UniProtKB/Swiss-Prot annotation:
Taxonomic classification: Bacteria, Pseudomonadati, Spirochaetota, Spirochaetia, Spirochaetales
GO biological process: tRNA threonylcarbamoyladenosine modification
Organism the protein comes from: Borreliella burgdorferi (strain ZS7)
Gene designation per UniProt: tsaD
Xref: PANTHER family: TRNA N6-ADENOSINE THREONYLCARBAMOYLTRANSFERASE, TRNA N6-ADENOSINE THREONYLCARBAMOYLTRANSFERASE, MITOCHONDRIAL
InterPro entries in UniProt: ATPase_NBD, Gcp-like_dom, KAE1/TsaD, Peptidase_M22_CS, TsaD
Descriptive protein name: tRNA N6-adenosine threonylcarbamoyltransferase
Length: 346
């Protein structure tokens, strides 16, 4: 079965063709550099650019896959969560294709797509612990299947990638913040500033994260945390912030691994491409899986891959389904698309 995957939840316009849930025939992504001068995503600009680009991106994906549009068996599309304008562009485009081609459509949760991405590269047996790190989401989950996901911990404020973006904006390091801070930090001393690392002692927040304190310390209280006579340079700020940002993840992650007694870890999301983070994770000395770099960031392949499996198990989505910018009725457990404990109706 050939699945056309469409992902437009934020600023990347992505279309892919995937066969049988795992064989990637094409995976096309168009970035939107227009946002760089604003140091962040402007929703109105993002949705307009998606409207202008999605047809050509789809044609490129089909051409690279050597596939005619009539040969597509299923259309998978991200319907939540994300920027509502961007989601609507992708969803309406997918609906138009489904209606005109008389093909089924399956709507996919963006978060579950990221959690599925590593399985397209490596054969990983369930259960395992997943760590999702992106500009919009930071969470730890226990996965028993592609549709059986228990959220153990999540950020209580900023996402990890969001904190990188805000620090980078303040110090004029460029957008997006993650890759720029990683590059700038290579020539810095990570011990110049001893920024605070947040860990929670309450049971209900045992696996949760917080980045607001670190962000505030780095932006507004810089000299308070200076511990060496090194100069206050962008390189040293970037290196010290990056160190603290990833140390922030380690304690909740260790707790989750110990308490669940699951020694397999899967890393997903755009921040997973950071090589410094990978060095930190490798020191945990557990079996760890990373998706290739093109599957770390937003992409259509993960939507098509998960869409294949969801369709086989649950069937198609109603054509009337709407885009949703948020995760409704957030619960800690996700089991299938019809379970009352869903954190997604996708």
């Amino acid at each position: 079965m050939k699945v056309l995957g469409i992902e437009t939840s934020c600023d990347d316009c992505c279309v892919a063709v995937v066969e049988n849930g795992i064989h990637i025939l094409s995976n096309i992504k168009l970035n939107q550099p227009e946002h760089k001068k604003y140091y962040g995503i402007v929703p109105e600009i993002a949705s307009r650019l998606h409207t202008e680009a999605i047809m050509s991106v789809c044609i490129k994906a089909l051409k690279k896959a050597n596939t005619k549009i009539s040969e597509i068996d299923l259309i998978a599309v991200t319907s939540r969560p994300g920027l509502i304008g961007s989601l609507i562009v992708g969803l309406n485009f997918a609906k138009g294709l489904a209606i005109s081609l008389k093909k089924p459509i399956i709507c996919i949760d963006h978060i579950l797509g990221h959690l599925y991405a590593p399985l397209m590269h490596s054969k990983i047996e369930y259960p395992f612990i997943s760590l999702l790190l992106s500009g919009g989401h930071t969470l730890i989950a226990k996965q028993k299947n592609f549709d059986d996901v228990e959220i153990l911990g999540r950020t209580l404020d900023d996402a990890c990638g969001e904190a990188f973006d805000k620090v980078a904006k303040h110090y004029d390091m460029g957008f997006p913040g993650g890759p720029n801070i990683e590059q700038i930090s290579k020539n810095g001393d990570e011990n110049t500033f001893q920024f605070p690392v947040t860990t929670f002692k309450k049971k209900e927040n045992w696996y949760d994260f917080s980045y607001s304190g670190l962000k505030t310390a780095c932006i507004h209280q810089l000299e308070k945390f200076k511990s060496k006579d090194n100069p206050t340079t962008k390189n040293n700020i970037a290196a010290s912030f990056q160190k603290a940002a990833f140390e922030n993840l380690i304690t909740p992650l260790k707790r989750a691994i110990k308490d669940t007694q699951i020694n397999k870890l899967v890393i997903a999301g755009g921040v997973a491409s950071n090589l410094y983070l990978r060095e930190k994770i490798d020191k945990l000395k557990i079996q760890t899986y990373y998706p290739p770099l093109d599957l770390c960031t937003d992409n259509g392949a993960m939507i098509a891959g998960l869409g294949f499996n969801m369709y086989l198990k649950y069937g198609e989505s109603p054509i009337e389904i709407d885009a949703n910018s948020r995760i409704e009725n957030y619960k800690n457990q996700y089991r299938g698309k019809n379970n009352e404990k869903n954190f997604s109706n996708a």
